[in-house]
Amino acid sequence: MNAKGVIIAKDVAELHGANNLTKQTALTEKGEVNNGIGDKPNRHDILTGSQPDGTAFSPDKDMTCKNWTSSTEGAAMLGHSDRLGLRDDEASHSWNSSHPSRGPDGGCSETDLPTTGGAGLLYCFAN
């Protein structure tokens, strides 16, 4: 469920399949809609570190900013909370695996994340 009690997915399989994650349901912890494409500032890049099926990348491919310990090395896989991107393709519409972070500091710093539309936000799921 999201912060307002709307069901996002009934289980992990549905979460990584036909889920209910949209800009209107992928709310902040305060129950507010997260800024996306067309909003200022765009904050739709969400830190996930996940492949589209929800599994981790192989250990030789860092997609978690050195297991969430570095702001200068590695990159993080990002999803789009509004399910929109610069292209009309599957990756751009993915909530959990759209593109890696990037930027002048390497992709993981507070300075890097806004360059592609992020703010260091993450999803929180519980059952």
Q: For each of these PLM feature ranges, what is it?
A:
Residues 1-127:
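Secreted/extracellular ectodomain signature
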